[in-house]
A protein has these predicted regions:
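Conserved ABC ATPase signature
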Residues: 249, 265, 269-318, 322-327
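Electropositive, glycine-dotted interaction segments
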Residues: 110-258, 262
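Phosphate-binding P-loop
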Residues: 31-37, 315-318
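Short, Lys/Arg-enriched N-terminal segments with co-localized hydrophobic residues
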Residues: 2-16
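Conserved P-loop NTP-binding catalytic core
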Residues: 55-131
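N-terminal pre-Walker A segment at the start of P-loop NTPase domains
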Residues: 14-29
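Beta-strand secondary-structure signal
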Residues: 20-22, 33, 110-114, 121-125, ...
């Protein structure tokens, strides 16, 4: 009933923090488990796997958008994204006593990604389909997906379990089949997000969709943030920052205006940022001490534009469970 549904969802309404990230068999990462805190700084030597860690996070985000298989295809397919080392590393290989060499594969091809959060955890296992004459015979498919409650995956706290085309949802002490014909190329988030019968799926999907990746803010002459854009209320800045002016206006209306202005003044004393609306299109105007006219976003230096993008990202009104950026 509605009361039971509310009780089931209520503890998870805030934007939860990730507590653990796990990656196996992805590019230069053989098996990695990373504890997460509120702020995480990843450093390491060249070739240590920093970019692979970041890309794995982006692949996880694609599961909630229905594009994880397409994202893998853009990276060159499953064969190009799998662990590039041998299937197993012997103790002597690890100690450097013998060369690292491969051998005949003993286990099925498998790429595993997952995370645990303050409320739910999620894991996905991608592999190759059974041999066929299909033109898509080399497309990866989803072998298994699991959603659980708590910091660790156990049978007792598993809430949703997908194996191939079949997905089951916890129903008290029993299991209920929620779908028997799931597409192998699409995550369960796009196929059984039922707020009444599978609220965990819907809640986790919206959480992942709230993740933001601010690693490639463009600042060239044709950058989206430099151009006037159609504007609507924008509680969270987009990945590419095209809605910067709308996000800025939203913060000024419903956010912490004093903190926003203080961040501008901290880098540019006496400056202020305004939003100009013409024909439904929003653009930024940058007024600086000593200048007789405001500068448009198209005139700003690369560094100034990126700084304003970061201010908008960090002063967002809506809670974000993951905001990620490359240094």
């Amino acid at each position: 009933d509605d009361a039971a549904l509310e009780q089931r969802i209520a503890p998870h309404r805030k934007a939860p923090m990730l507590t653990t990230l796990a990656i196996a068999q992805y590019r230069s990462l053989h098996a990695l488990v990373v504890p997460m805190a509120r702020l995480n700084l990843v450093v390491g030597a060249n070739g240590s796997g920093k970019s692979s860690l970041y890309r794995a996070l982006r692949l996880l985000a694609e599961t909630a958008q229905g594009g994880v298989v397409s994202a893998l295809a853009r990276e060159g397919g499953l064969q190009s994204t799998l662990w590039a080392g041998p299937e197993t590393l012997s103790a002597r290989m690890r100690r450097g006593e013998v060369p690292i060499e491969g051998g005949p594969r003993q286990q099925p091809v498998s790429l595993k990604l997952g995370f645990a959060g303050e409320d739910f955890g999620y894991a996905i296992d991608l592999g190759l389909p059974a041999p066929s004459r299909s033109l898509f015979a080399h497309d990866p498919e989803i072998k298994r997906e699991v959603i659980w409650g708590g910091p660790f995956l156990r049978l007792g706290n598993t809430l949703v379990d997908r194996r191939g085309a079949l997905v089951r949802v916890r129903d008290g002490r029993d299991w209920r089949v929620a779908g028997e014909h799931l597409n192998p190329f699409e995550s369960l988030f796009g196929q059984i997000a039922d707020p009444r019968n599978a609220p965990e799926v819907l809640q986790l999907r919206e959480t992942i969709r709230g993740w933001r990746f601010y690693d490639h803010f463009r600042a060239d002459a044709d950058a989206p943030a430099r151009l006037p854009q159609l504007g609507t209320r924008t509680p969270v800045l987009s990945h590419d920052g095209h809605d910067l002016a709308a996000a800025w206006a939203t913060i000024r209306e419903i956010g912490d205006v004093e903190a926003l202005d203080a961040a501008v003044a901290d880098a540019f004393p006496g400056a202020r940022v305004e939003v100009l609306v013409e024909g439904g299109r929003f653009s930024l105007q940058f007024r600086q001490h000593g200048l007789l006219r405001p500068l448009s976003a198209a005139e700003l230096s690369d560094g100034t534009l990126r700084y304003l993008l970061w201010i908008a990202a960090l002063h967002t009104r809506s809670a974000i469970s993951l905001a990620n950026s490359l240094a």
